[in-house]
A protein has these predicted regions:
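Glycoside hydrolase catalytic-domain groove-lining segments
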Residues: 62-66, 212-214, 226-296, 312-316, ...
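Hydrophobic faces of well-ordered beta-strands that scaffold small-molecule active sites
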Residues: 30-35, 77-79, 109-113, 162-166, ...
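Aromatic-rich peripheral "rim/lid" segments of glycoside hydrolase catalytic domains that contact
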Residues: 43, 49, 272, 293-310, ...
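Acidic-and-aromatic substrate-binding clefts and catalytic sites of carbohydrate-active enzymes
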Residues: 42, 47-49, 54-60, 83-93, ...
């Protein structure tokens, strides 16, 4: 009996201790990239290069993108997961494929749950097709089951995520219309209760899978101080460990502000959120303009690097800012995912690789940032 008990304990220790090792310690400054499009880009034949790595004839040769960015200083990777996208990209299996590659490179991992079959953002939070007719209670159970299914699949691969997002850019709620926030009615229809309930269910499922995982609730526009949002979340039972923000400071058309104004407001906002809500902040998405060729590209690259340098230095000065993730920096050369074509969407113009397929100055600035610890 004693031998059986010993074997069971030993087996338990093995199962909880066989995760991939990370190159940088938990809680240190995250210099990350969201690389969720990488597998689709590779399938389309896109290649990545590093001017410092050439063959014996002096010719550039293709590099593994994750390995190369790791060499430049990347220590974390963010990956989105959709419930059931028609193409299969960013579904569980695709996310697992990329997560395993990142883990093999010693990366810390963030999983970004959209709880949708396609992009979720402030203007779109579409219930997955398979969940369309669910009641609120059934949606809560679906959120729980989906979260556990994905996280236990990671655990089976020996991957222990450090962070998990319960929803993507959700200032207006999630799983619309059931969890859509209607600010005018001050929760008269229970919308805040339902949205906060979804975050709580996701939070508890994440903690069931990984007890010490950091759970993030993520909103857009780091330059906007939404203290009222976080107060309402608390009031209605929402749960989180860390606040996540997006920041695209060169998009004046969105904000009507200059990039120095947006960076300054973002710094003030991050400091105020940390002070008022006593939790750390993560910049889950950042992006700088990246387009053109020849002299046009060179001018854009220089300006983007100035903006990035300013923003990184501001965030480095804040003890409880835990890091910055660049959103899809690997995109270059006008590439766009297949589903964008029938939608009439253009390519993403805030990637951070040059027209020659090499990391830009702005990306190198982020990945070479020197803050070693982030105190929470």
């Amino acid at each position: 009996m004693k031998r059986i008990l010993f074997c069971c304990i030993a087996a338990g220790l093995f199962l909880t201790g066989c995760y991939y090792k990370t190159d940088s310690p938990r809680g240190s400054w995250a210099k990350g990239c969201d690389l969720s499009w990488l597998s689709e880009m590779e399938s389309d034949g896109v290649q990545f290069y590093n001017d410092e790595w050439r063959d014996e004839n002096g010719e550039l040769y293709p590099q593994d993108c994750i390995c190369m960015l790791h060499e430049f200083g990347m220590n974390a990777v963010r990956l989105r997961v959709w419930v059931n996208h028609a193409t299969g990209w960013s579904n569980k299996e695709d996310m697992l494929y990329l997560a395993k590659r990142a883990a093999e490179e010693g990366m810390r991992i963030m999983i970004d749950f959209h709880y949708s079959d396609f992009f979720a953002d402030p203007s779109h939070q579409t219930i997955p097709a398979a969940w369309q007719d669910y009641t609120y209670e059934q949606l809560c159970e679906a959120v729980r089951e989906h979260t556990l299914d994905v996280l236990y699949a990671l655990k089976e691969e020996g991957i222990k995520p450090e962070w998990v997002q319960i929803g993507n850019e959700t200032p207006n709620g999630m799983l619309w219309p059931v969890g859509q926030l209607v600010y005018e009615d001050n929760n008269a229809n229970g919308c805040w209760d339902r949205y906060a309930g979804f975050t709580k269910i996701g939070y508890e499922a994440a903690k069931e899978a990984f007890r010490d995982i950091n759970v993030i609730v993520h909103v857009d526009n780091a330059y906007e101080y939404r203290d009222w949002f976080w107060r309402a979340m608390k009031e209605h039972g929402g749960k989180w460990d860390m606040i996540g923000l997006s920041h695209y400071p060169m998009m004046a058309a969105w904000s009507g502000k200059t990039w120095p104004e947006m960076n300054d407001l973002a710094e003030t906002n991050v400091r105020q959120l940390i002070s008022e809500f006593h939790c750390p902040v993560m910049i889950c998405e950042v992006g700088m303009l990246n387009y053109g060729t020849d002299s046009v590209y060179q001018a854009v690259e220089e300006l983007s690097n100035i903006v990035m340098t300013d923003f990184v230095e501001r965030m480095e000065r804040i003890d409880s800012c835990m890091g910055i993730f660049y959103w899809e920096p690997e995109v270059y050369g006008g590439w766009r995912p297949a589903e964008y074509i029938p939608l009439g969407w253009g390519g993403y113009d805030m990637g951070s690789f040059t027209p020659e397929g090499q990391p830009s100055k702005a990306l190198k600035t982020l990945l070479r940032s020197k803050k070693l610890t982030a105190n929470n």
